[in-house]
Amino acid sequence: MQTFVATPTAVERRWHVIDADGVVLGRVATEAARLLQGKHRAIYTPFLDTGDHVVILNAERVKLTGRKEDQKVYRQHSGYEGGLRVERVKVVRQRRPVRLVEEAVRGMLPKTKLSNAMYRKLKVYAGPTHPHAAQKPTSREVAST
C-alpha cells in the first residue's frame, strides 16, 4: 500500500464562519489559522495548500485579555528614515478593527510561500454581516473562556 499524498485537484475547499463577538483574539486566530492551513483534515499536507476559506464576523467586538488594550502596539515602517509608525490597540480598534484579527491570524500562519495563498482565503468583517452567503458557509464555535 502506498502513502497517500494530496494533490491540488483533490482538495475540496469549504467555507467556515467564525463569530468573534466576545471571544478572546488568540482563540479566534488559532482556529482560523488551523482551518486556513487545512490541519483539520485527514489529507493535510505541509507543502500543499489544503485549507478552507474562513469568514470572521464581529471583529470590532473581539476580546483582549489583561492590559493589552493599553499596552500592546502595532508597528509599521515606511522604509524611510524616521518612518516608524506606532499605534496602540485602542487606536487601531477605533480606526480599523479588522486589522487586529488579520494581524493575529497572519502571525500564526507558516512563514513560507504558501502563507500568501492561505491568507487570501481569510475574510474579516467588523460587523455581523458578510456577502458570502452564496457559498453556504458552516458556522464554527470557538470557546470564549
Regions found by a protein language model. Name each.
Residues 1-103, 113, 131-145:
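Ribosome large-subunit tunnel/peptidyl-transferase-proximal elements
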Residues 106:
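Acidic, metal-associated active-site segment
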Residues 109-131:
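C-terminal structural segments of small proteins and small subunits
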